[in-house]
Curated annotation (Swiss-Prot):
Family: Belongs to the NFX1 family.
Role, per record: Mediates E2-dependent ubiquitination. Confers resistance to osmotic stress such as high salinity. Promotes H(2)O(2) production. Negative regulator of some defense-related genes via an salicylic acid (SA)-dependent signaling pathway. Confers susceptibility to the compatible phytopathogen Pseudomonas syringae pv. tomato strain DC3000 (Pst DC3000). Mediates resistance to type A trichothecenes (phytotoxins produced by phytopathogenic fungi).
Organ and tissue specificity: Expressed in seedlings, roots, stems, leaves, buds, flowers and siliques.
Consequence of gene loss (knockout): Impaired growth and survival under salt stress. Reduced H(2)O(2) production. Less susceptible to Pst DC3000.
Name by which UniProt lists this protein: NF-X1-type zinc finger protein NFXL1
């Protein structure tokens, strides 16, 4: 929406030059504004070239017209191309219909009949391009004064009838008052223009200029350095090459950076820096960078909301011909005009002015073109007719640029010696200009043969132009003998036919070798060859020989070549030179003759090009092969053929990427879930229910195309022996590999037999023997025997069984019984001789004196009712000093010692919590040295890693689990010193024992490229950094706030989880175990948020397995130990009575009993999940959990 600044006009003509209404474009999305600007003097020079230079680059302005009888209309006016304000006669009236006025390109004073009236009908006035006098217009009045003038582009003084007098009262005319009263406010106009979505663009402006102006108005341009938006009021710098816009502070920092310097330009031109956008070299220093408008005329331009941001509003004035024009361009070829647009970003438009008339290349016609087209080929289309270089014929081509072609006219010409006549091309002859009949024009390459001036001899030169010259044997030219050492007297020779006398001296002429002289007597003719013996080297310089000198210098002489091969690598770097006596053996390229280079590999490359179809046809070379130059002239389609690229295409062009679904139907019948592709279709990914290969469980959400699904359960199928179950994890059938000849036979499975022995409670240790009874051998299972009081113990073989085959009392022993008896700590108690042999495992040891003393002490304790402290549990090693330190502190502070022992127990036996790292660590609070030593001793019993950190008095101890960590033989404070299998009670945080978890930040499983130097630099004096190993570290702070800050700011930091649980307000201690998991809770409760991590059926396990046992279990330590021993040593069965598996009825019934028990127990744990009816499989949702 535009608003008008109206004022009264004075009758005085000089007053009209003080102010004038000019148009200033705001942006592409808003309307124009009429403001007052001072006018140029009347004599301002405006030439026609400047006028036309900006005619094609005018912005189009939109003005809203208000009519009383209808909605507002729009009126498009074109901007004047004059530089500066227009003359006073170029005032415009508003409320004119569309396309009413067209521009006039007449140059000169305006004609009287060229006044334009407003409120005229559409297309009334058209642009006049006539060179003669203009035709009179038909004036139409529409409630307008008689002397209302239209805009004219004529240059010159205004006519006198173009004056407007002000009203006497100083007010506007009635019609103008009505227009002004109907003018809308600015904000309302903007809102209406926005609602109507009016887009104002000028096709004559470069697209980059329009885009930059629009982005600057919307503040959507990003600085390439800081990636921040460039605002209207920000100081900027614009590159003159790529027109990128940067913040002034950002570009100054870039210019000061060492990486922005162009090293080549720095050597030649001094200080410089490169533009971040186009890398063009800027030959200014960072201190000289300043904020200027786009045309560079005004420094620190003010922010005007009606102008393009960062524009000064003045004419651009940049030369339309860049100073980096081609080198061959002369000053006359450069454009003399400047840009007349308002100060703008981006490139200036091409010049639209007319250049001075120029002649065509042939010079017959003068051509007038635009200034921007002055370097184009200006041909007139007529025949050239220029004289060719031969000087005899004219050019017959059409008017052309550049030199004329050589003359191709055929002429009959004779040679210089007049022996031969040929038809030659005129342009190939050396003789230029007119030809005379007696002159030859070319050489026939034969001897001339013309008689010389003496008349006695003939010319021996090759056919040549001009006279032949004088005879060389004339007395006037021969002054000496043949060798030149003796001068001849004039009276000796009278004519050229007289012989030349020779002297008696040695010739001494320099031979062709240029090293020796002729030793013959003065003679006629050429000197004989040089016979001096010289040393000649071969081409490679490794061998030499003695030969006559003329052999080394004669052009036809034999080349001396040795037999030594070169062996150096050729230019390809792959093959070696096999040339014998190679001149490049010693790296001397000067010895090469002609273009021959023996180290240029002549083997074809023949490598496969990147296209994969063609081979490299170049010679063997180093580096990458050039791209394939073959072309494809057929459509390049995808696999389904629905997406293609039309030819021509370069060989090796990848197939188009097709986003359509694959048309091949899935064999399973599900819908396609993958895109177009080459080759076989991927497996179907639709989730379905599937059984594992062993038939143990039904897995849900399994991809349909996934094959060979295995769970983690034991196979349990009966093997071919009929006695044992397969102990492998879930696998496809069969469990045993066998030959066809063994079909139907019971074959050993190579497992231990496991049948109960008849002589003892142990099982048969022999390999499976389905077709034979168990061998009657002595039992070799290790058992423990004791004395009567139980103090002395020893481990011996069971020794039961082992009768001979004939039933006699002769036993077969598989070991040396005497050596076992010698190692016993005490002798065996005697037995009665009843004739039956008592196995060694069923006998007892004899008590000694120490046993008697302990028995007496026990009797006294029972008599006096004395209960001594359980210090026996501390005697767990041979280190008496360590035992005394712990025992002493245990007597003084048993609660503290038990607390430390409990935390070590949780580190070794508990499960990690709160982190994906397998490392378990605990930090004790700062304490005195004697307690730190006790912590170290207790941790060493559990084989834990121990380290101390910090300074006194805040030095603390850190313990963590290692690969060697394991429970000790006895635990301090436990009854009998045994380790319970049940889950331990989680200890709670104690400020007298444990470090506050809020002060610790963990850095666990650090990647190799991780760098925590930021922690050292920022929090170096506020924390202690403790390295547990090369990938795990802890940071212990002194303040909670700084620890929380480090947790937020530092990478790879995580929450510290020790061996204690911080008790929250009102929460029962039994809700969490030591690692933060509910005892007895299933994976369904923990991972109920993720449907892929659910398991319907859970199996209880001890603390060493996948699940924690309930705290406070009723099973004793002995029962738990026996249970763990049974899990590791007992054979796997498939029925309740494994010895009756061969009976069909019993086997089928008993086999389903354990599975039924599993289903019954699982039904009480699941949340509404029911097993599949009529099958013995378990149904689970988490197939990943099962396959782990």
């Amino acid at each position: 929406m535009s608003f008008q600044v109206r004022r009264d006009r004075s009758d005085d003509r000089s007053h009209r030059f003080n102010h004038q209404q000019t148009w200033i474009p705001r942006n592409s999305s808003t309307s124009s504004v009429v403001v007052n600007e001072p006018l140029l003097p009347p004599n301002t020079d405006r030439n026609s070239e400047t006028l036309d230079a900006g005619s094609a680059s005018r912005p189009v302005y939109l003005q809203r017209q208000h009519n009383a009888s209808g909605p507002p209309s729009y009126n498009h006016h074109q901007r004047s191309s004059n530089i500066g304000p227009p003359p006073p006669n170029q005032h415009r009236r508003y409320n004119a219909p569309d396309n009413q006025h067209q521009r006039s390109d007449n140059i000169g004073p305006p004609q009287p009949n060229q006044h334009r009236r407003y409120n005229a009908p559409d297309n009334q006035h058209q642009r006049s391009d006539n060179s003669g006098p203009p035709q009179p217009y038909r004036h139409r009045r529409n409630n307008a004064p008689e002397n209302q003038h239209q805009r004219s582009d004529n240059i010159g003084p205004p006519p006198p009838n173009r004056q407007r007098r002000n009203n006497a009262s100083g007010t506007l005319p009635d019609n103008r008052q009505r227009v002004a009263s109907r003018t809308r406010p600015v904000n309302q106009g903007k809102r209406v223009a926005k609602e109507e979505n009016v887009v104002l663009t000028d096709p004559n402006l470069p697209q980059l200029v329009q885009e930059l102006q629009e982005k600057l108005v919307k503040s959507s341009i990003e600085c390439m350095i800081c990636y921040d938006k460039v605002g209207r009021s920000a100081n900027i710098w614009s590159c003159s090459s790529c027109y990128s816009i940067f913040h002034i502070n950002c570009i100054k920092r870039w210019a000061r950076a060492p990486t922005s310097v162009d090293l080549l330009a720095e050597k030649n031109q001094g200080d410089n820096w490169r533009c971040p956008g186009c890398q063009s070299v800027q030959l200014t220093s960072s201190k000289e960078i300043s904020y200027r408008c786009f045309c560079g005329k005004r420094r620190d331009p003010p922010s005007d909301p009606y102008l393009t941001p960062h524009s000064c509003g003045e004419p651009c004035g940049k030369p339309l011909e860049k100073e980096f024009a081609p080198a061959e361009t002369t000053e006359e070829d450069l454009c003399p005009h400047v840009c007349v647009l308002q100060c703008h970003p981006g490139p200036c438009p091409p010049c639209k002015a007319f250049a001075p008339p120029r002649s065509c290349p042939c010079g017959k016609k003068m051509v007038t073109t635009r200034c921007s087209e002055r370097r184009s080929d200006l041909v007139c289309g007529q025949r050239c007719d220029k004289l060719l270089s031969c000087g005899r014929h004219q050019c017959e081509r059409t008017c052309h640029v550049g030199p004329c072609d050589p003359c191709q006219v055929l002429v009959n010409a004779t040679c210089f010696c007049k022996k031969k006549v040929e038809t030659v091309i005129c342009g190939d002859m050396n003789v230029k200009g007119e030809l005379k009949a007696e002159d030859g024009v070319y050489s026939c390459s034969f001897n001339c043969g013309k008689p010389l001036g003496c008349g006695n001899h003939f010319c021996s030169e090759v056919c040549h132009p001009g006279p032949c010259g004088d005879c060389d044997l004339l007395p006037s030219r021969v002054k000496t003998c043949y060798c030149g050492n003796t001068r001849l007297e004039e009276q000796i020779r009278q004519s050229c036919l007289d012989p030349i006398p020779s002297c008696s001296n040695v010739c001494r002429k320099l031979l062709p070798c240029r090293l020796h002289t002729c030793n013959e007597m003065c003679h006629a003719g050429d000197c004989p060859p040089c016979l001096v013996q010289v040393n000649q080297k071969c081409r490679c310089g490794s061998t030499s020989r003695a030969v006559e000198c003329y052999i080394t210098t004669s052009s036809e002489a034999e080349k001396f070549v040795c037999a030594k091969p070169c062996g150096r690598k050729k230019n390809c770097g792959r093959h070696r030179c096999s040339e014998r006596c190679c001149p490049l053996l010693n790296g001397k390229k000067n010895d090469l003759s002609g273009d021959w280079d023996p180290h240029v590999c002549q083997i074809p490359c023949q490598k496969k090009l990147r296209c994969g179809q063609h081979s490299c046809e170049s010679l063997c070379h180093s580096g990458h092969c050039p791209p394939c130059l073959e072309m494809i002239f057929t459509d390049l389609t995808c696999a389904c053929g629905r997406t293609s690229i039309p030819p021509p295409l370069s060989c090796g062009t990848p197939v188009p990427s097709c986003q359509l679904p694959c048309p091949i139907p899935q064999p399973c019948g599900h819908s396609d879930t993958h895109g177009c592709h080459f080759g076989d279709c991927p497996p179907c990914s639709t989730p379905v229910e599937k059984k594992c290969v062993g038939g143990h469980v039904v897995l849900r959400n399994i991809p349909c195309g996934l094959k060979d699904i295995r769970c983690t359960k034991i196979c349990g199928k009966t093997r071919r022996c009929g006695m044992h179950a397969c102990a492998r994890t879930c696998h496809p059938e069969p469990c045993d590999s066998f030959n066809e000849s063994e079909a139907g036979m019971r074959v050993t499975c190579r497992q231990k037999c496991g049948a109960p022995r008849t002589d003892c409670r142990h099982t048969c240790a022999a390999l499976c023997h389905p077709s034979a009874p168990c061998p009657d051998l002595r039992c070799e299972f290790s058992v423990t025997i004791t004395c009567s009081c139980g103090r002395i113990t020893a481990t011996v073989p069971c020794d039961a069984g082992g009768r001979s085959a004939n039933g006699s009392n002769v036993y077969c022993a598989a070991y040396d019984e005497a050596s076992v008896l010698q190692k016993l700590p005490a002798p065996l108690q005697p037995v009665e001789s009843s004739g039956n042999r008592i196995p060694l495992g069923q006998r007892k040891l004899s008590c000694d004196d120490e046993c008697a003393k302990l028995e007496r002490k026990r009797v006294l304790q029972d008599a006096f009712d004395i209960t001594p402290p359980n210090l026996e549990a501390l005697h767990f090693s041979e280190n008496s000093a360590m035992t005394e330190i712990i025992s002493d502190l245990y007597r003084r502070d048993p609660k503290w010692v038990l607390a430390v022992e409990e935390r070590c127990k949780f580190l070794v036996l508990g499960k990690a919590r709160g982190s994906t790292s397998a490392l378990k660590v605990h930090i004790f609070c700062p304490m005195q040295k004697d307690k730190r030593d006790t912590v170290r001793l207790i941790a060493e019993r559990w084989k834990l890693g121990v380290s101390n950190a910090g300074w006194e008095p805040k030095r603390f101890t850190v313990v963590h689990v290692t690969a060697k960590s394991k429970p000790p033989t006895r635990i301090i404070g436990a009854r009998g010193g045994a380790i319970s299998i049940g889950g331990p009670h989680p200890p709670f945080y104690d400020s007298l024992v444990d470090m506050d978890p809020g002060l610790v930040v963990s850095f666990l499983d650090l990647p190799r490229e991780a760098n925590i130097s930021a922690l050292v630099l920022r929090f170096g004096g506020e924390c202690e950094l403790v390295w547990l190993n090369d990938k795990n570290a802890l940071a212990v702070f002194h303040d909670h706030a700084r620890a929380a800050t480090a947790m937020r700011r530092l990478e790879h930091g995580s929450v510290y989880h020790g061996a204690v649980v911080v008790q929250s307000g009102g929460q029962s201690p039994s809700l969490n175990n030591v690692w933060g998991k509910l005892p007895g809770s299933s994976a369904w409760d923990v991972d109920k948020g993720n449907p892929w991590r659910r398991a319907v059926i859970q199996e209880s396990d001890d603390s060493w397995g996948a699940e924690d046992s309930p705290i406070g279990g009723s099973s004793t330590d002995a029962q738990a130990s026996a249970l763990r021993s049974a899990k590791s040593n007992s054979p796997i069965v498939t029925s309740v009575n494994r010895w009756s598996v061969l009976e069909p009825k019993k086997a089928s019934t008993s086999t389903l009993e354990p599975i039924a028990q599993i289903e019954e127990s699982s039904s009480s744990k699941t949340t509404g999940k029911q097993p599949v009816e009529g099958s013995g499989e378990e149904v689970v949702d988490d197939w990943e959990k099962v396959c782990e």
